[in-house]
């Protein structure tokens, strides 16, 4: 029965992954992500049903567009596969069981899916464009408020802690508004701060702090490798110039998902040892 559940979760996950690839491409271009038909970005030909089956279409078409024969970027296959596996792992660490599936479990799993959607979209867009998309940030704030209301009303969580998170949201949004008025552009830093607050709401302090530490280490390693490779280049960039090209949101999101899965798995392991 568990295998059947994991197959279902994997299939749901790869369809979400297909949506993620579409959204990461379209959102920065401000294109519709729900009603506009999928099309090839090279020849603009509308894709048929057989072109839209996650993973399988990529394999059967040998990684090429059926209409213009242009190569399809492997990120589509990678993200769809990883998304499917992520859903399976989430179901496993949350101990989902078809025979004993409670309403609370369904709600908690749904909130995690909404959160994963936020993390993947904000991270993917940042990796492709080095930009913290404001629409995705707003989506993160909305699902955070929904989750906080759920925790406070249903699970009687500490309302003061979430009140602090709301206050932090307001402060950062005010700073972002000031930055927008003064410099006529959204601040990358405020986008990162909004992302961190959303991480705090869904994953707690421990996972968030761990994610930040891993991100800083990854950035330090990246800078070190760059220095070693480019040390003989007379026109090499400074650390400050390089840091402006690093997609911090991507590293932060990736490390957060890994940290969250690891903590949930360890929690289950401790309960199993003690039980």
Give residue spans per PLM region.
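A membrane-topology feature that recognizes alpha-helical transmembrane segments
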Residues: 1-275
